[in-house]
């Protein structure tokens, strides 16, 4: 498929994209996919058949900004008016077409699973680029996991308000920040990888390139409610420099692993932040106050940078609030953080974490700090939250497994510049036998149907299976399976005699993973 111009999925409509689909973004028209408020996208790829959005150009000719990107707009809360138009250069279209925000934290914009987004971020005007993947007030019922954004010409992922929750994200060699959170975003992220390229950075006059950046809002006094307050856990954030020599050679635009400012309450847990010149910056008094009050937390986290690990707006140690010392705060014994003094990135991640190809391997040593320093999911702002998967290691990768058995296996691509897409999408894996547990959810048959149809799915190992049917409002109308089943193919009959005509979505959950498809009942 060729994506040309601004392609809007209209409110109440559903766009379905099948596993293995290849969508090429057109440069001349700035191909961009916008899922409007009230619409849904159902893009459920698999580890062996990811869905790929990429440049229309040939291998070797692709560049950041070759096309637009993906923008998903929802009805969850933000701290901006619901008439706000999303960032991205849409000044020439009707304002209502790109609005976002509402009052429903349980809003669903659909499903994004096993999706790659490559070479997006076309500039519609000076300093006005589309991000790789933009979420505008997207709600927590939206399913987001296994997403890779590569070579974005702005941010990889940007969250404007909303509370979407996502796991297994990759940001690869982007221009600006990997993650940018604004306007009251209060979602959750876990198992996140970022890797940066020393030759790709924001060289604009006002720009800088950070690991992630977070603001409550862009204008003083930064007091809008709800506050930007996401929780990030198990992040592996790898900058462009493996050691002091590489850091000293970086352009001055390379800044922080994490820039937290303008009253944000973003919190970081169980993570590894390495490879920049500088570490975490609590940029202003409002952000420092959030740290003092326990609304902004950094716990069980390791930093490895060669110059200044912790900063405020005035100096490396002393902040703008009398008596606040960011290093002392970070070193609070119960926080169990590491890295308040300078050290090399390779002290906690391997040198192969700085490879810029499919030989990239960030898996830490089995006896190293990230494996042994400790984690926690029961204290502070994580207390009582069962969404996070508790693991014993810091960062995104299990030190006991090789890269070929990590969650990135099969579907990710760390060298999209040279990938030949002439024959469509293929999985990137040295051995399919090394892939983790997979499952497949087939299209129901018949479809459309009246009143019965059959849903078929396959699981590779015995597992707990839940097969559920929802209407387009996200309301559950039937639970077809909720039991442990053996490996193999399973067929389930669905009788919709008691339902009205319309579109329904059936979801399959297997041990935490999920896929979804739509079906149409016509009476």
What are these regions (language model features)?
Residues 4-7, 480-484:
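Beta-strand-rich interaction surfaces with strong enrichment in secreted/lumenal proteins
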Residues 519-523:
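Short beta-strand edge segments in extracellular beta-sheet folds
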Residues 462, 481-517:
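Short, surface-exposed loop/turn motifs with a glycine/proline- and acidic-biased composition
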Residues 429-445, 449-470, 490-496, 510:
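Glycine-centered coil/turn sites that cap beta-strands in beta-rich domains
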Residues 2-14, 27-38, 45, 54-154, ...:
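Extracellular beta-rich repeat passengers
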């Amino acid at each position: 498929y060729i994506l040309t111009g601004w392609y809007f999925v209209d409110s109440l409509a559903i766009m379905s994209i099948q596993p293995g689909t290849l969508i090429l973004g057109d440069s001349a028209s700035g191909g961009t996919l916008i899922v409007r408020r009230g619409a849904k996208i159902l893009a459920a790829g698999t580890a062996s058949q990811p869905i790929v959005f990429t440049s229309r150009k040939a291998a070797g000719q692709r560049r950041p900004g070759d096309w637009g990107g993906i923008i998903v707009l929802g009805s969850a809360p933000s701290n901006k008016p619901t008439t706000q138009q999303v960032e991205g250069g849409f000044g020439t279209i009707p304002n209502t077409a790109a609005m976002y925000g509402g009052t429903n934290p349980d809003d669903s914009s659909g499903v994004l699973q096993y999706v790659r987004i490559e070479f997006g971020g076309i500039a519609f005007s000076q300093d006005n680029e589309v991000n790789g993947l933009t979420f505008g007030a997207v709600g927590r019922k939206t399913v987001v996991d296994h997403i890779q954004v590569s070579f974005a010409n702005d941010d990889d992922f940007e969250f404007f308000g909303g509370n979407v929750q996502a796991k297994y994200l990759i940001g690869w060699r982007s221009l600006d920040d990997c993650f940018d959170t604004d306007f009251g975003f209060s979602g959750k992220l876990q198992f996140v990888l970022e890797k940066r390229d020393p030759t790709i950075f924001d060289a604009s006059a006002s720009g800088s390139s950070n690991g992630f950046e977070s603001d409550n809002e862009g204008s003083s006094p930064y007091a809008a409610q709800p506050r930007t307050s996401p929780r990030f856990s198990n992040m592996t954030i790898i900058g462009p420099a493996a050691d002091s020599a590489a850091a000293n050679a970086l352009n001055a635009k390379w800044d922080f692993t994490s820039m937290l400012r303008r009253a944000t309450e973003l919190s970081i847990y169980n993570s590894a932040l390495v490879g920049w010149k500088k570490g975490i910056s609590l940029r202003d008094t409002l952000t420092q106050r959030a740290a003092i009050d326990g609304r902004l937390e950094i716990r069980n986290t390791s930093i490895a940078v060669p110059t200044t690990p912790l900063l405020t707006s005035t100096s490396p140690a002393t902040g703008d609030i009398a008596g606040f010392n960011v290093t002392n705060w970070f070193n609070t014994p119960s926080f169990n953080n590491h890295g308040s003094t300078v050290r090399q990135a390779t002290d906690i991640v391997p040198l192969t974490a700085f490879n810029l190809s499919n030989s990239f391997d960030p898996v830490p040593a089995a006896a190293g700090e990230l494996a042994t320093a400790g984690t926690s999911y029961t204290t502070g702002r994580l207390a009582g939250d069962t969404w996070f998967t508790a693991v014993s290691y810091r960062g995104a990768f299990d030190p006991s497994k090789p890269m070929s058995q990590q969650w990135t296996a099969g579907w990710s691509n760390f060298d999209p510049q040279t990938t030949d897409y002439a024959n469509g999408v293929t999985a990137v894996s040295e051995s399919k036998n090394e892939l983790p547990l997979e499952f497949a959810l087939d299209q129901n048959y018949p479809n459309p149907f009246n009143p019965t149809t059959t849903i078929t799915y396959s699981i590779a190992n015995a597992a707990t299976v839940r097969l559920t049917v929802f209407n387009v409002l996200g309301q559950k109308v039937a639970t077809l399976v909720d039991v442990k089943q053996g490996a193999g193919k399973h067929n389930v009959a669905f009788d919709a005699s008691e339902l009205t005509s319309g579109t329904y979505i059936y979801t399959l959950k297997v041990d935490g993973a999920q896929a979804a498809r739509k079906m149409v009942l016509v009476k």
